[in-house]
A protein has these predicted regions:
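Active-site signature of cysteine proteases
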Residues: 1-167
Length: 167
C-alpha cells in the first residue's frame, strides 16, 4: 500500500495475501513458542467492550432490523463496510482436542479498565471475518510462502479498500 509506513522515507510494508486457513497455523506456532504478534482488525464490529469479547453472536442485528446481512468479507471490504481499524497484540489461543482454534486472546492498548483487564477474547469465527493483518516472524512461515516475497510486489494506492480504514 503506497504511503503505508511509519516514518518519512521509510519502506512501504510488503504483504502476502493468504487464505485464513493458512494464516492460523502460523499464529498458533508463534503463540506456542511464546511469541506475540502485531494484529490488526475491524475492532468495532460485534465488540462487547464491557465483557471484552469479539464474537459474531454478541448482538443479533438481523432480528432487530428484520433483515439479513449477506455480504461476505470480500464484499464488505470492496464496499468499505469493513476494514482494518485498530492494531493490537495477539498473545494466546484456546485449541480444541483436534488442535483447532476456538478463541484467541488479544492484548489491547485501551488500558486495564477496558475489556477484561486490558485484554479481549476473540472467537475463531470473528477472526475469520474481521482479522486483516498479522505480522509473524519468518521462522514460523514455511519456505513456499516465504518464496512469494521474491516476487515483485504490486503497489496498491493509498485509497485501496483493503486498508482504507487503517489510520
Amino acid at each position: 500500500i503506497d504511503y503505508d509506513r511509519h516514518m518519512y522515507d521509510g519502506y512501504n510494508w510488503t504483504y502476502i495475501n493468504l487464505p485464513v486457513e493458512d494464516i492460523k497455523p502460523l499464529a498458533i506456532a508463534s503463540i506456542k513458542d511464546s511469541t506475540a504478534m502485531y494484529f490488526s482488525c475491524d475492532v468495532a464490529k460485534f465488540l462487547d467492550s464491557k465483557k471484552g469479547t469479539l464474537d459474531l453472536r454478541n448482538y443479533d442485528y438481523e432480528s432487530l432490523m428484520g433483515t439479513t446481512f449477506g455480504m461476505d468479507k470480500k464484499q464488505r471490504i470492496q464496499t468499505f463496510a469493513s476494514g482494518s481499524s485498530h492494531a493490537m497484540t495477539l498473545v494466546g489461543v484456546d485449541l480444541d482436542e483436534k488442535g483447532m482454534p476456538k478463541k484467541w486472546l488479544i492484548e489491547n492498548s485501551w488500558g486495564a479498565t477496558s475489556g477484561y483487564k486490558g485484554f479481549l477474547i476473540m472467537t475463531d469465527d470473528w477472526f475469520d471475518e474481521y482479522m486483516f493483518r498479522l505480522v509473524v516472524e519468518k521462522k514460523y512461515v514455511p519456505q513456499n510462502i516465504l518464496d512469494i516475497l521474491r516476487q515483485k510486489p504490486t503497489l496498491l494506492p493509498a485509497w485501496d479498500p483493503m486498508f482504507a480504514e487503517d489510520k
